[in-house]
Design a protein with these regions (language model features):
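Bacterial Sec signal peptide processing site at the extreme N-terminus
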Residues: 15-32
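Structural signature of alpha-solenoid helical repeat junctions
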Residues: 24-25, 29, 61, 82, ...
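Short solvent-exposed coil/turn linkers within tandem alpha-helical repeat scaffolds
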Residues: 55-62, 93-107
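Short coil/turn linking the two alpha-helices of tandem helical-hairpin repeats
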Residues: 74-78, 111-114, 118
Length: 144
């Protein structure tokens, strides 16, 4: 009986906590999404990250959700891999949450992805040029 009475003040104190459950929910959701990424459930993780961004845009966990989403999009092993989307996600993180704890990492990711995208664009341009030259060469061979 005395145990129950000792627990009562703790229960009352917890009920009067200044941090409502909704303020703890975003961090829990980000942790859940991170776990889903580790389990290889990229699609579901993406949905959870997006939920945090939609429902808690002003919570500090929103920056963590963007960071997790950007890493998911940048991962070569991810079925959601899109370097352009990842670059845009890290840019959004830097724009919307410039003082977040992820600022330095997001800046580094964005720089690396920007370089990668520039190289991919140049590679595509060169492949197209090679294809045009190949066709021109074939046309010249036929005319001989």
């Amino acid at each position: 009986m005395t145990r129950g009475l000792r627990a009562l003040p703790l229960l009352l104190l917890a009920a009067c906590s200044t941090a409502p459950v909704s303020f703890r929910a975003p961090a829990r959701l980000v942790a859940q999404a991170d776990d889903l990424v580790e389990q290889g459930q990229a699609q579901e993780a993406s949905r959870v990250y997006e939920r945090v961004l939609r429902e808690y845009p002003t919570d500090p966990a929103a920056a963590s959700a963007l960071y997790g989403l950007g890493r998911l999009q940048a991962s070569p092993a991810s079925p959601l891999r899109s370097y352009r989307a990842a670059h845009a996600t890290f840019s959004r993180l830097l724009s919307e949450y410039p003082q977040s704890r992820w600022e330095r990492e997001a800046r580094a990711w964005r720089a690396v992805l920007g370089d990668l995208l520039a190289r991919e664009d140049e590679s595509a341009r060169l492949r197209a040029q090679i294809e045009r030259l190949r066709r021109t060469d074939l046309d010249l061979e036929r005319r001989r």
